[in-house]
């Protein structure tokens, strides 16, 4: 290969000289799924038209996780707040749906409208320790992306409320125990996140422990089970897409921004459905006219505000950790929710619940160790690659072809 051809390699691979990937994207979702197109560069040699050099950059287009991950101070604060607001929202939802005979679609509408209005205030009015910065540019498929994520978000909320209305809290959380494995698959397909064998194996006690927590749950309902499983899949897909938007290199959204845009998109998509299919004055299962007393309105507004805080803290935490780590943290939250439901709603404690909790705790510890080992291994590989960059690129070109040209 000529000297001119060799000089092109560092220029193309320089991180500061990133260009948009050439070629046409498939439909309008190419930028979301095509994470590898921005990491691979083809360069032609001057000596032969058949000669080509493949350069793979090390920098990912999506920052999967920071160095400390969930153990950073800010991530721990977000995690604690997310747990707290999630518990408050969960039990208030159960109270409204069970004791007040509320409809899931009505409660979902209140939650989405509330979080949209509060998010609008936070975006356009400087408040709540958040100063919104005006964005100069948006992704080319911004509207379609937000509509898609917003639809998934609303579907997750409504399906979760349907499962909560038809089955016990503990059973709904048990069905969600398979979330980590769905997240591993989707994160690999969409973000290109690599999880090693040890990390994948550590997820088994996490999922199995949560399933054991309520293995004797007898309030099985096919509608509630189907809704809980659908919520699980939709939530994993939404989390992976949200991570792509929160941690992208070129277009990165803050947690309040993403929360507001997706909520507004969900409301815009589903206003016709609410108008034609919901009978607002009659929302009780018994069909009686619902009385909007001051206490009921206060409960609904409180539920909407708590749901907003839960969503914002979840997005903020998601921006700091990987989707798989977020899924493991969510599994821990589900296990704690089971024990809190036992305390609050008086469900019986079983030996399997205790064993399951121990397994979840052990699985989380194993996951942290496996994750740390994987990060150290990858860091050592990157260090070795940076010390001898030419040794990694030379074998990509046949030795004899460089001698003849």
Curated annotation (Swiss-Prot):
This is Solute carrier family 35 member E2A. It holds the Pfam family TPT. It comes from Mus musculus (Mouse). Belongs to the TPT transporter family. SLC35E subfamily. GO terms for biological process: blastocyst hatching. Putative transporter. Its main location: membrane. It comes from the Eukaryota. One of its GO terms (cellular component) is membrane. It is a multi-pass membrane protein. It is found in: Membrane. PANTHER family: SOLUTE CARRIER FAMILY 35 (PTHR11132). Keywords: Membrane, Transmembrane, Transmembrane helix. The chain crosses the membrane at residues 76-96, 106-126, 142-162, 167-187, 195-215, 219-241, 264-284, 296-316, 326-346, 347-367. Residues 1-22, 380-405 are annotated as: Disordered.
